[in-house]
Amino acid sequence: MKVKKILYLLVGAVLFVGQSAVCEDIRIVGEGANSKLSLTLEQLSGCRKKEGLRFYSVLKSDLTRSGWFKVLTKPKAAIEVKGRVFVSGGSVVAECNVVAPATGRCYLSKSFSAPACSTRKLAHTVSDAIVLAVKGVPGIASSKIAMITSKSGKKDIVICGADGQDVVKLTHDGAPCLSPTWSPKGNALYYTSFFRGFPDVYRIDLNSGRRTRIASYPGINAGADISPNGKLMALTLSKDGNPELYVRNLRSGKLTRLTKTISAAEASPSWSPDGRQIAFVSDTTGSPQIYIIKASGGKPRRLTFRGKENVSPDWGPDGRIAYSSRRSGRYQICVVDVEKRTDKQITSEYVDHEQPSWAPDGRHIACARTEGYISGVYVLDTMGDAQVRLTQFKGDWYAPAWSP
């Protein structure tokens, strides 16, 4: 039963249906951990014309979605974005100065440009630059989210923006697929597909669209995750009979087996940010729990003890691990600080929240939420903002993977 349980976790998705300092005198909106800096775009000229208006609308939405700012409609705020937006030849140009008027501090002074057909992309770039300059963390506006869509029994992988727009379909074969994950540079996507009738691992080059089968050992090939340096791939293989955790050198093809369990199985590997450890799921104690093991091998250390089942670990950029925990009959998203050994439950509604994936800002998490047998991808804010539905289309959407 142990193996059957963990194999369900491995391939169940196939059947799934449903830091910079801020001066003390800067005005803060709100209280507690989710306090926001007030920010205004009202001193940005050129936003009443067609492209400028579109730029303003997207930038305002991006900055609000970042969670760090309270965007005001009046001209004065703790952070003011000044400058102008204009069209020059075939390009849209945004000249931006981001300042704190109370102190005179200039966070950012830069000119950005993009083809006239890429105004949305330009706004995303500016938003990320503002977040990085003011808060010292990566922005998420330009990031992408891969996920699986299921319609009329056909499953494919798609990519969309962090705002749910610009949806692009990557696969068109309708074959059962699961576990999409990004390369560290964001130029390729790895996933498991039953395209040839067996669970094999594939790689899609996002520049050329070329698909390559890279792991097709006998039995299960699943849960691929690429190391931060891009040289190694952790995955689950059953080529020797039992689903075990392996690391494969992507250049030489050399395999290193990390686990050796007789009656249990391992799944869902996730690399630590420094590439030295791997989090994974094992049912060696009778129920699926999360463990950590050195990337070179050794004795695994159990990480989770609360919850009947703990699955789908995703190691975030700041060292915390998000996972799905079955508590009070439902799967909820939780976050554990590996060093402090503290555990925080992020969701609490009596619906299932599964398959968490960290955003590059270390604040937001994408997950699959299932309610009434219908699944959609939602974005959670670990600092308290309300969750937001990302997918607004028909069918089921799940297994999100946020780009680096």
PLM segments and residue spans:
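Short loop/turn segments immediately following the C-termini of beta-strands
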Residues: 150, 194, 199, 238, ...
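Amphipathic beta-strand/beta-sheet edge segments enriched in Tyr/Trp
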Residues: 77-129
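A structural "domain/chain start" motif
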Residues: 22-61, 65
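Residue-level detector of Asp-centered blade-edge/turn motifs that repeat once per structural unit
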Residues: 139-141, 184-185, 228-229, 273-274, ...
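Structural motif
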Residues: 91-93, 153-158, 198-202, 242-246, ...
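Multi-bladed beta-propeller domains
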Residues: 161-178, 205-222, 248-266, 293-309, ...
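Hydrophobic beta-strand positions that form the internal "hydrophobic ladder"
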Residues: 145, 189, 230-233, 275-279, ...
